[in-house]
Amino acid sequence: MNNSNNSQSLYQSLWNAADILRGKMDANEYKSYLLGLIFYKYLSDKLLLAVCDNLDESFDSLSQAQRLYEENFADPDVKEDLLDVLDDELGYFIEPGLTFTALVAKVHTSNFQLEDLAQGFRDIEQSNEIFENLFEDIDLYSKKLGPTPQKQNQVISALIKELHELNLSNHDGDVLGDAYEYLIGQFASDSGKKAGEFYTPQAVSHLMTQIVFLGREHQKGMTLYDPTMGSGSLLLNAKRYSKESSTVSYFGQEINTSTYNLARMNMMLHGVAIENQKLHVGDTLDADWPTTEPTDFDGVLMNPPYSQKWSGDAGFLQDARFSSYGVLAPKSKADFAFLLHGFYHLKHSGVMAIVLPHGVLFRGNAEQKIRQHLLEEGAIDTVIGLPANIFYNTSIPTTVIILKKNRTSKDVLFIDASKEFDKGKNQNIMTDDHIAKILKAYQDRQDVDKFAHLASFEEIVENDYNLNIPRYVDTFEEEPVIPLTELADKLAQTDEEIAATTAQLEAMLGQLVGTTPEAQAELTASDCRQTSFWCLSFLLFLEKNGCFN
């Protein structure tokens, strides 16, 4: 079986484990249980591997590794050495009796207690600052798991048994990370509108990340920043497009603690070193972060909540992020507040990509003044119109805006990718081919009929700094011209068909009315049904031929 099939098998097995919780709570809730337990198993299996590696012991199964751990931990001298090694290499520690493998053994002998798992969670959370409160969203005693402690125990036991069948130690960090990302996407699909707070569709993530990394694939020590990071998927795509991904540093902030915990797990499952991730929980607009070095970044990637309300207090006019613009984003729409925050933290040589609703391109008043200021600075490099209905939390079309600080030109490239999608079951889907077409237009920076236009600054000024894409990219498709003789022939043919159908209908109506009381009495239900059919057929025929337009 090839790696692709292995990955798909792992994805499906992990998703099937959700069946145990599905129906007890919605996807937005049960994702914490499944993802949290997968992460606990990952940490546990990784610990057993580290123990055996440091003891220079080989093993054939996790159960054998568990026995080696228990035996050596019982020796006081070996125990102290192991604790030092685990703290140094992993940054966390799990008691031998609380590893995932040990919990499975307890489940099989009916000795498992929820407190065992709860204690394991606490041990990890207290072992290192980076794990603090990591499992706080997993309520092992929730009534949604079952009405009694016994029922709750049974559900968690079943989930532990299901996940134990998967040997996560057989997969490298990228496969596990991708599997985790797959699950997050599946949860987003199941969660619908609730998903917007934690997930950016992979196609959009790939497009934005590739743009940020264009020409910098081999740059070492790249710094990336996402102040509305959700699950961290935008940041983590750097592992695909950087040739020096092990040197990339990730900076992210998230206001929702549950989503923040999800991002932390996602980072670690993707193999991002602890020293390369600086994640923070907080309100991006109300309290700027980071405020200590580094405060500007090579790449800024953002998919903020759309048209969200914010305080917009006049005091923000003195905030370095907004002060040079003279106005603030409207209190009812924080879109430009998020954009200016990200742009403030962009290096002079950096690239920023942000997803926003189309309204930011043309709304007036304060937003127009901010837009004008950015355009006069040459900050707006490219505007890409995405298809409608590609996000889980909204069906509206969105736009990706690319910003830079070191441009010498004020022109703007417009790309209308609104038709670049395939129809999916619930959402429209952008494929690799669609993304490649957009990237080519972005790199070529030339006009493409009905797809892209490079607008001069003078053209934008003439449009009063309105960046609405249809003003610059004409996608109108003209109807083919039909010769008058051909049109006349079609009309004559249609008239003949209408006349024939009318005659048939009149004959049927004549049968329906009857000429004598006796004839009327002979009408049958079959006659009525047949006449109704002809009436309906006639109406459909008229509609098809445009008689109701």
Question: What is the meaning of each model-derived region?
Answer:
Residues 263, 524-539, 545:
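N-terminal amphipathic/hydrophobic targeting modules at extreme N-termini
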Residues 1-212, 275-284, 385-388, 410-418, ...:
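Non-catalytic, mostly N-terminal accessory regions of nucleic-acid modification and defense proteins
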Residues 194-302, 307-316, 322-325, 336-337, ...:
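Conserved S-adenosyl-L-methionine
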Residues 41-51, 187, 216, 242, ...:
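A generic secondary-structure signal for well-formed alpha-helical elements
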Residues 5, 286-287, 292-525:
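A conserved structural/catalytic subdomain of Rossmann-like adenosyl-cofactor enzymes
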